[in-house]
């Protein structure tokens, strides 16, 4: 999607409610649930803090907002883009003009469910203008797509009428693009393109988008009925929703969970309090889970997200650190700017052992990922995109990457011998610069989140073992949840990113193109540059300029620009992006570890009943299928069985394959 900032999702969301798993428990083990087929109950891990859906990029907000507000299009259960507010649309022959025709009688309602106004074409114009005026964190999704939008956003023009979005009448909205984008419609599921009612916006002023029940209007399947910080979030069905016949839940209740008692999820499921529950093979109580539910524990599929580690290339904040001297800080910074040092960390990191902390050995490899963009996200001349990346990566540095396997569900980069080799090279070069060893790397961790803390400890263990404590020491910084988030996931500037390396954040694509992954590190506009400790565009500090020069970020920017310029040949476009991705992997500035999914759960959610998406606001690590939306989701009286899950998955995959074949035929 999105940042997860959403498109970012944090690895803290261990038990997030919106990961509705298509799996279950023994049919006789949670009889208290039998009457709760119209209510979904589970947990959430982090409070939402912004309901301005045109602005926020954080998954902790968008996972809720996708249930409250609809845009022009949405994803159905098979991943197809279908009409939401729009009933139909037209595309010009040159691929630059998209015209959407709205449904009749679609309503905005207030937090009590009372009709407020009709949704009109002008609301989409208002929404985009507000996104710019409110300095949207997600404007990058469309800023360089729509005619005149970049000029308006930069202040070159103050006349919004010159921007390529027009309400042709109350039911017709039209967008004019700078160049053709085959993936344009997939951007319609993103919040920056959602409508805003001008009257309500004006009445709310600065309070618009507050994380309260009355901070926004609703035109989606649910209405927020209650939000009490670090306590509970509750939705109720929107009875004025245009497609309410496909909303099968009357209520959604999410209870705050700080992650300190993972075993409690299953126990609450058994008691009938929760609709589903993650289960943890590494837990001492897991044997009881298996005893009670062995025929119902199923594993979710990988989604399109990725999580991993990023190096802070220009650290400026040192609130959470074990370093005592200025020299220690400078030595670490020099080490991080050394490519061989970064590659040594990557090769010395056992991702399977890390992942096993939450899934056990049986699930250790299930969600592993080795590149930023999933290997099968798009096709290049009939082959997976990942194949092209692997070929380009091997050619860029045969000694380091020849034979490296980038496929999902296996650790393609762990190589202890190679790690020692690259550490020796790095140490020789760094000692010549006066750097003292061992290098200390600060890694923040939430002190109460037991599972993610165990992952941090695993990272420390394997890296120090394979590289030697005389070379590298990982200093885990135990922080409160609020301080942890402030230093990592919620840091909005490079200067606020307080770590040497971090595993706090992840990413899901905003739209169906590799650029949605790779542009996050664009040196001129990248929305994730702050995670690397870097400024967007012109450097604000000498350290920033030196860091960008050290890793040759300008070359990466040039590769992205070359790929983006190709608009009439998707094979050539994707091949060009594969070269950019190979550059990113070669640089070692980030380490992709895993996606969401690949986890065991028990559940009463009917398998594959909800929407599926690989990009946009509808994505998350949802093992129902990859959606945060509860539209279409069904709950059954008895827990889902393994046999039911497998049968549903087989049918769902077959239908997806049939649809893909039909789409390929129509495109030809």
Task: Give the role of each language-model region.
Residues 363, 399-509, 595, 656-657, ...:
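Ligand/substrate-recognition segments at binding pockets and active sites
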Residues 43-93:
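N-terminal lobe/hinge region of extracytoplasmic solute-binding protein
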Residues 160, 171, 177-255, 264, ...:
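Gly/Pro-rich hinge or "lid" segments in bacterial periplasmic/extracellular proteins
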Residues 225-240, 255-324, 352, 356-361:
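Extracellular/periplasmic solute-recognition and catalytic clefts
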Residues 123, 133-200:
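Surface-exposed binding/hinge segments that line
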Residues 122-124, 174, 250-251, 305-387, ...:
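Alpha-helical secondary-structure segments
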Residues 346-393, 451-461, 492-668:
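Detector for C-terminal structural segments
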Residues 87-141, 331-337, 342:
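Aromatic- and charge-enriched surface segment that lines or borders ligand/interaction sites
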């Amino acid at each position: 999607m999105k940042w997860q900032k959403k498109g970012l999702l944090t690895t803290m969301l261990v038990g997030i409610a919106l990961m509705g798993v298509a799996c279950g428990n023994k049919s006789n083990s949670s009889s208290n649930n039998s009457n709760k087929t119209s209510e979904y109950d589970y947990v959430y891990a982090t409070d939402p803090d912004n309901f301005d859906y045109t602005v926020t990029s954080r998954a902790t907000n968008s996972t809720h907002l996708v249930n409250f507000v609809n845009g022009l299009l949405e994803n159905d259960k098979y991943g197809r883009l279908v009409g939401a507010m729009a009933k139909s649309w037209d595309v010009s022959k040159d691929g630059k003009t998209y015209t959407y025709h709205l449904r009749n009688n679609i309503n905005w309602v207030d937090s009590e469910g009372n009709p407020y106004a009709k949704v009109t074409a002008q609301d989409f114009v208002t929404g985009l203008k507000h996104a710019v005026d409110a300095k949207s964190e997600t404007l990058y999704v469309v800023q360089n797509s729509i005619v005149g939008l970049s000029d308006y956003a930069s202040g070159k023009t103050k006349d919004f009428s010159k921007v390529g979005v027009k309400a042709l009448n109350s039911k017709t909205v039209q967008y004019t693009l700078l160049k053709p984008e085959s993936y344009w419609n997939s951007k319609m599921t993103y919040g920056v393109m959602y409508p805003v009612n001008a009257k309500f916006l004006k009445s709310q002023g600065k309070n618009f988008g507050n994380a309260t029940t009355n901070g926004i209007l609703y035109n989606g399947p649910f209405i927020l009925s209650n939000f009490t910080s670090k306590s509970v979030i509750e939705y109720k069905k929107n009875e004025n929703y245009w497609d309410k016949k496909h909303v099968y839940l009357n209520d959604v209740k999410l209870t705050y969970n700080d992650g300190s008692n993972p075993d409690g999820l299953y126990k609450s499921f058994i008691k009938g309090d929760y609709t589903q529950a993650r289960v943890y093979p590494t837990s001492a109580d897991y044997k009881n889970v298996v005893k009670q539910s062995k025929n119902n524990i199923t594993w979710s599929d990988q989604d399109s997200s990725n999580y991993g580690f990023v190096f802070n290339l220009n650290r400026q904040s040192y609130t959470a650190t074990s370093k005592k001297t200025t020299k220690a800080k400078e030595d670490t910074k020099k080490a991080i700017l050394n490519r061989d040092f970064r590659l040594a960390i990557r090769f010395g990191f056992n991702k399977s052992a890390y992942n096993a902390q939450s899934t056990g050995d049986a699930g250790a490899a299930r969600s592993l990922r080795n590149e930023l963009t999933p290997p099968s996200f798009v096709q290049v001349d009939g082959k997976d995109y990942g194949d092209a990346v692997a070929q380009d990566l091997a050619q860029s540095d045969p000694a380091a990457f020849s034979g490296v396997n980038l496929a999902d569900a296996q650790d393609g980069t762990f190589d202890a011998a190679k790690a020692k080799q690259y550490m020796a090279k790095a140490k020789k070069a760094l000692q010549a610069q006066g750097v003292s060893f061992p290098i200390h790397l600060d890694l923040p961790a939430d002190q109460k989140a037991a599972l993610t803390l165990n992952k941090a400890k695993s990272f420390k263990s394997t890296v120090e073992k394979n590289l030697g404590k005389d070379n590298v020491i990982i200093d885990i910084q135990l922080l409160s949840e609020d301080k942890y988030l402030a230093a990592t996931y919620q840091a909005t500037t490079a200067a606020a990113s307080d770590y040497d390396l971090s595993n706090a954040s992840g990413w899901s694509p905003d739209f169906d193109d590799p650029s949605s992954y790779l542009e996050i590190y664009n040196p001129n506009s990248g929305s994730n540059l702050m995670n690397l400790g870097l400024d967007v565009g012109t450097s604000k500090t000498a350290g920033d300029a030196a860091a960008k020069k050290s890793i040759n970020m300008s070359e990466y920017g040039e590769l992205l620009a070359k790929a983006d310029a190709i608009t009439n040949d998707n094979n050539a476009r994707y091949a060009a992006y594969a070269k950019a991705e190979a550059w990113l992997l070669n640089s070692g500035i980030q380490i992709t570890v895993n996606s969401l999914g690949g986890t065991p759960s028990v559940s009463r959610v009917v398998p594959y009943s909800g929407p599926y998406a690989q990009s946009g606001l509808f994505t998350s690590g949802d093992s129902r299928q990859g959606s945060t939306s509860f539209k279409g989701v069904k709950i059954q009286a008895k827990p889902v069985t393994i046999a039911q899950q497998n049968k549903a998955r087989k049918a769902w995959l077959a239908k997806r394959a049939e649809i893909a074949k039909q789409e390929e035929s129509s495109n030809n």
